[in-house]
Amino acid sequence: MTILKKDPRDLAKATGSGSAVIHFKEIRGEVDQRAAYLYFLPKLSSYDSYVQITILREEFNQGAIPLPSDNVQTYIKLGTSAWSANAGNVKCDWDENSGRAAGTFELINSQTEEKISSGNFDVTFPVKK
């Protein structure tokens, strides 16, 4: 079978709409005395593409935090492209006793102003003291 490929820049613009959902196969993270560090990976143990969200402790249990925020950092990497969200929101509820973080995120692409990723999480991970 011959594989045919064309550069998307050479194709005509079509009309319509579309959307995609990134399904995360793995969530990695930890919480220390400063922040929660969350990595959402579409492939197990692969850092070719991921969504990273870092939330400082002062934003825990504060409801949805609008982006940009000095207390919430985001980084989205899809293949060779990478950027930070400049709009959207992140919410993280934290239970110190159980080491459980639950929340939601909606991240907007700073280059196109379009929603790139949104989702929710409910994870338990080690607490570094």
Spans of features found by a protein language model:
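An extracellular/secretory-lumen and virion-surface interaction module
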Residues: 1-129
